[in-house]
Amino acid sequence: MRSKQFFFIVILIVVFGSCKKTEIGNPGPNEVWLEYKAFNPTQIQVDSGSTITFTNKDNADHSVTANSGLFNSGKIKSGNTFTFTFNTKGTYYYYCNYHSSNSSEQGAIIVK
């Protein structure tokens, strides 16, 4: 009986030990993720001339639209990206057209 329990435990270790782990990470320094109907991070600071990549990691469609009208991604489907280069110093506020009532779907890029 003991050998059956040992064998069963070994099998469980092998099966679960070989399962792929999904890592939950964070965006890179010039990256904003659209996930869980929110921007992550909601605020980012970059140098003038920096390009920011917005990546939709959510199942829902999103957009990245500047309050000033400077940029508008249009619809960003799941898994797609939008990039924009910020050449002028200032603070640029943006939101998602699809979820603009959600305060988590608003953000700011601070260009130094």
Please report, for each region that a protein language model flagged, where it lies by residue.
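Bacterial Sec-dependent N-terminal signal peptides
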Residues: R2, F6, I13-Y36
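Extracellular/periplasmic metallocenter environments
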Residues: K77-K112
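Beta-strand cores of secreted/periplasmic/IMS beta-sandwich domains, seen most often
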Residues: T42-D58, T81-T88
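Extracytoplasmic/periplasmic beta-strand context in beta-sandwich domains
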Residues: N30, H62-S63, G107-A108
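Non-cytosolic beta-sheet module surface loops
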Residues: Y36, T55-D58, Y98-S100
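N-terminal, post-signal-peptide metal-ligating segments of extracellular/periplasmic oxidoreductases
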Residues: I24-T53, V111
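Short, Lys/Arg- and Gly-enriched loop/turn segments at beta-strand edges
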Residues: A60-G69
